[in-house]
Amino acid sequence: MLAKVLRKGSNVLFKSNNTKTLRMFGACNINSLHKFGEEIESKVMNMMQTQISKPTLRPTKEREAYSDAHDKTPHCNGCHKCGSWERDIPLMTIQEAVREANRCLKCNDAPCQKGCSTSIDIKTFIYCIQNKNWYGAAKCILSDNPLGLTCGQLCPISELCARNCNVSHTEQGAIKINRLQELAVRIFKEMGVKQIRDPNRKNLPNSYKAPIAIIGAGPASLSCATFLGRMGYENVHIFEKVSRGGGITSNEIPQNRAPIEEALWEVEMVEQLGVKIHYNKALGRDFSLEDLKSQGFESVFLGIGLSDPNTGIKGSSKEFALSVERARQASNFHYSKHFLTQVGSAIKKGGNQQQLIDAPKLDGHVVVLGIGDTALDCARSAFRLGAKRVTVAFRRGFQDLRANDEIFEPARYEGINFVAYASPLEYEFDSNGQIKAVKFDKNLPQNNDNDNLKYKNTNQIFSLPCDHVVQSFGCVLPDEQWVKKLKKSDTLLDINTDTQQTKAYEWMFVGGDAVGTKNLVDAVNDGKTASWYMHKYIQEKHGQKVPETPELPGFYTEIDDVDISTEICGVKMENPFGLASAPPTTSYPMIARSFDIGYDFAVVKTAVLDKDTVFNVSPRIFKVPDPLRQECSYGNIELVSEKSLKYWVEGAKQIKKDYPNKVLIGSLMAAYNKQDWIDIIHQVKDAPFDMIELNLSCPHGMNEKGMGRACGEDPDIVRDITSWVTSQTKIPIIVKITPNYGQAEILAKAAHEGGAKAVTLTNTMPGLVDPYPDGESFNGVGIEKNIAPGGSTGSILRPFAMRKCVDVAKFVPEIDIFASGGIISGDHGINYLHYGAKALQICSAVQNLDAATVFYDLKTSLQANMYANANQKLKKNGWKGQYPPYQFEKLKTTTAFESAQKVPKILEIVGAKLAKVSPIEKMSKQIIQVPEISKDSCLECGRCYVACSDSGYQAIQFDGYNNVPRIIEEDCTGCAICVASCPVENAIKMVPRKLPYTASRGIPPSSDCPPENLITIPPYKF
């Protein structure tokens, strides 16, 4: 039974069934309406500032106590890491990623790409992330680096891409490229979409059936196999000596840096191309190189890595060599290679692994000798295996570290001790033959060379007591006969570094650690490089021609097969994307370039009669928001095309000859003069335009001449001009509508009555750019620095254009719609389609970045969203298009590969969401919601509290730092300003109220108040 609402003065009382009275927390005092109530003042508003920059006084000891008690930095003493193999650094959140991606400059000829071993198009994938196009980003990454997920986790970017980043010298430093890469591929992984071979690679010659052997299933081998599989080779076999693939990523690098699930997913992606992996097959044990040749394998890739530990005996002193031989008998001595393999087998469960072994049991003080990545992996693992103290001792100084920053800094944060300039002399043993200490000599710089890299022992002897020792002096090739035939030195194989081909055998190629490759990403590139030259070797052997310039196929899935063709005004298009009549279509060469990129149509820059020819002022294009912000919104006072009408006619003939299947749309403007419109139509009659757009909406410059917007704000004029034009031509006519007229549907109706087949919604909105505080424009015209109201475009225009698209689609369904206005991302594009548009005109996005990158993002995003929307499994798991559910990485949802159901065509989704846009009076009032704050996600910043207190209903209580704000449901009206102002995605969500809700009127309204608004909404019951 609903609670009864009683009115007593201005207070609202709830009387429940048990007669217990509840008073509203924020009830008004009729005698002090301009003051907060006592409870609001004392419990809510007490934390709100009223004076700023007022000096304060606080004892230093109080500050010190606070800083110690609430330290949120990543430092620790290592002890809490015991037994925990969780990721060191949590996966970057989507919100963090979008902010970081926005910080990227998207440099042309990007230095980061040149610094990337696999030459990933970093600019493009970061732009895709900026637009939340996860598939586009992942496709871009995986096209060049098939192991993009584990490389994102392990890439030493401080030595590669980030080292060359153009913002590396700034306060925030280089872009976190590896973190962005990992997130994009991880989200794609959760989509569960299979890699397939590009279906265009069919009817290949029999040479593509040549047997190919790949030895080892590590990063270089998996990369090589992937590209061979993508090229179309059907008979690729990997022979792996252990029971799972992935190489050191799966078997040695610790779980906290490289989770096994990600590495095995990458192995599975290789198998999806038809590559066969044979486990527990070792070269030298189960087969020989001669065996492979005799079995018909035409080419072999060797990616076995360095399988044996460097004992440290060769080249060392006699004392150290003898002590190493003795140490190998001690149970507390470990080679790093064996140590990490044992840890990996015990901790990283998965794949075809059958027998699990115990991890090494450590305690006390562990000393690690060496300072490479492997040594630090051992040191950090030691903490997790029970060590109370870990020391890394190394021969040189910190400036000569072999380890990269990405692993050294986390090791330092974990409390590992570092002893530099320590050259090991020998191990010391106790009576039981166990190592009890390591004896060192100070190995100091000699200062007699320019680089200060020469060191010498100084006979300053010291010992470091220990309970365990891990010796990490690197690894070497196995001492086997086949290795000796390929060696160029005592440690590495001899190859042509341009092709990865061995000098001993023309049919053999090698990559990875065995040839001295320094890191995981370089190993992937070795395999990638070898794949092309293996392909070249095989094809030329079979008499086939191979291009001199490598042409490697990229990453491909079912998403790339999604049909995004459309039809508008009876004209078919392969995709809905085209360039608007704007600066990007200033000339025909620019339009031709857009066609080469993939845009399916272009609207030429607006042409006028010669008598109306214009001359532009300079400068005339500017940023509408603060120029310091990289927001995709522009303003302009550019007029119509300065080129002659004849240029646009003659050029149309030439471009349609070269691009007969592309759609070319003319754009015309004239005054409200029938003869002018008849003349201009007759002058373009020989131009092979597929459609003609009438520009009745240019908001500046032409308006003063009685053209553009001057003709487009009166439905009668729109109808007249349209009818004059349609009476002279059979070409479909489009009317470009102004956003300045309140009811776009009335203008669209008039255009349709005049014979138009479509409307473009919309042109730009006139506005002024912010000047400097002294009133001078940022980029004014002439000596006077004058400015004029100009057309505002991009993101700032989109809300208005989208609303007009909805209105026209609902009220004038008989007319087709070209959407135009802030279409920056694929998300925007699909929203316009859902709201009734059939084709999408692009401008600001291309002004902000190159047309090719923009098209790639738009196309892949639209395809991915359409695919994901049709995938019922993804929808069931909470995906919104390709946008993953909140905290997807913790949901443990299966990533089993599953095809989408039939993906609808674009014309099937046009207008599909119009019913979601409703007048307010028709919206449900039966569910009143209140915010719910997630304690796990809340940063305790108080932003929601501030917004609610000064711009809401004083319904959030906040007791200061280190406290999660508390929602006062009795006073909450469900406005959701807290959600809008929260800086953390999904930290606050709206849920149905648990209490009844009655609107607080302050003073009860008179009897004129509609009774339907004097209601109490009960709690919603699901």
Give residue ranges: language-model regions.
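A conserved FAD-binding loop/helix module that cradles the flavin
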Residues: 378, 514-538
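Flanking helices and flexible, charged tails adjoining ferredoxin-like Fe-S electron-transfer domains
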Residues: 42, 175-211, 250, 254-276, ...
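Alpha/beta catalytic cores of nucleotide-metabolism and tRNA/nucleoside-modifying enzymes
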Residues: 36-40, 48-49, 74-89, 537-562, ...
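Alpha/beta enzyme core
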Residues: 593-596, 671-818, 826-842, 919
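Beta1-alpha1 glycine-rich phosphate/pyrophosphate-binding loop at the start
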Residues: 63-90, 119-130, 140-142, 169, ...
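Iron-sulfur cluster-binding cysteine motifs and their immediate structural context
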Residues: 106-131, 150-184, 275, 832, ...
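C-terminal helical cap(s) of enzyme catalytic domains, especially alpha/beta-barrels
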Residues: 614-629, 770-789, 833-834, 845-871
